[in-house]
């Protein structure tokens, strides 16, 4: 007699803006359920991004298995699509071993790809892309960003206006398909990963508190040696940095110190900009999560008692 296929256990997802306490909560939950952590962070996957990527401590990594941490070399391609596919495979493998997964991170496209799946987007069109790049060179990011904001404000709100790669791609998709990225993603609404059930919790806090935490964490990173880490990367990967082709080397916390090392800004300005750019990034993360994902928001724990209480609640969820 055939037995019914066993239902997959739910996957706990913990998301939120940077500095909201996701990693600590994920570790606490994983300990309670005997699970493993799937890191949804596009920088933590790379070796050598340590302090600037706010990687878990060596003790945390030794205590609970963290997937997608220290698995790639800088410059090695790894897309959101790669993450979505590989993360789903690892979660299913964990389930077969009788273990559960805790997904934690703030990389918006990693999370969307895993939880919702991606819309089928068209391949690049060389002619359209060349024309848009020409417009970018002549008119600058600001005008192209305004053009995107008029056509797809939800997508525009999730982008850094100073970065051109996703801006150009978003406009290219509109010209090729006649539809915006937001419209295509809304049409997709499909699960790509079989019977996986994601229970998504978002960590919320007052904006002033979040910004204070960001500023404090930046100061702690500086004290821990972030500048020396950035300086080492600057000298080792100078050609890659200058090429602008490796997006991870353009990320917050590193690019500002690279500008200082290039003699473009002062050290104090670099620190100030890291804080400012991190706050801007947190705002874009929140916009994305509210616009593109279905999230159960809860107050972020601000002390050890609140952390343990929330971890206990999540561990006993569906």
UniProtKB/Swiss-Prot annotation:
<comment type="subunit">
    <text>Monomer.</text>
</comment>
<feature type="binding site">
    <location>
        <begin position="16"/>
        <end position="23"/>
    </location>
    <ligand>
        <name>ATP</name>
    </ligand>
</feature>
<dbReference type="GO" id="GO:0052381">
    <property type="term" value="F:tRNA dimethylallyltransferase activity"/>
</dbReference>
<keyword id="KW-0808">Transferase</keyword>
<feature type="region of interest" description="Interaction with substrate tRNA">
    <location>
        <begin position="41"/>
        <end position="44"/>
    </location>
</feature>
<feature type="region of interest" description="Interaction with substrate tRNA">
    <location>
        <begin position="165"/>
        <end position="169"/>
    </location>
</feature>
<keyword id="KW-0819">tRNA processing</keyword>
<feature type="binding site">
    <location>
        <begin position="18"/>
        <end position="23"/>
    </location>
    <ligand>
        <name>substrate</name>
    </ligand>
</feature>
<protein>
    <recommendedName>
        <fullName>tRNA dimethylallyltransferase</fullName>
        <ecNumber>2.5.1.75</ecNumber>
    </recommendedName>
</protein>
<keyword id="KW-0067">ATP-binding</keyword>
<dbReference type="Pfam" id="PF01715">
    <property type="entry name" value="IPPT"/>
</dbReference>
<feature type="site" description="Interaction with substrate tRNA">
    <location>
        <position position="129"/>
    </location>
</feature>
<dbReference type="InterPro" id="IPR039657">
    <property type="entry name" value="Dimethylallyltransferase"/>
</dbReference>
<dbReference type="InterPro" id="IPR018022">
    <property type="entry name" value="IPT"/>
</dbReference>
<keyword id="KW-0547">Nucleotide-binding</keyword>
<comment type="function">
    <text>Catalyzes the transfer of a dimethylallyl group onto the adenine at position 37 in tRNAs that read codons beginning with uridine, leading to the formation of N6-(dimethylallyl)adenosine (i(6)A).</text>
</comment>
<dbReference type="GO" id="GO:0006400">
    <property type="term" value="P:tRNA modification"/>
</dbReference>
<dbReference type="GO" id="GO:0005524">
    <property type="term" value="F:ATP binding"/>
</dbReference>
<dbReference type="InterPro" id="IPR027417">
    <property type="entry name" value="P-loop_NTPase"/>
</dbReference>
<keyword id="KW-0460">Magnesium</keyword>
<feature type="site" description="Interaction with substrate tRNA">
    <location>
        <position position="107"/>
    </location>
</feature>
<comment type="similarity">
    <text>Belongs to the IPP transferase family.</text>
</comment>
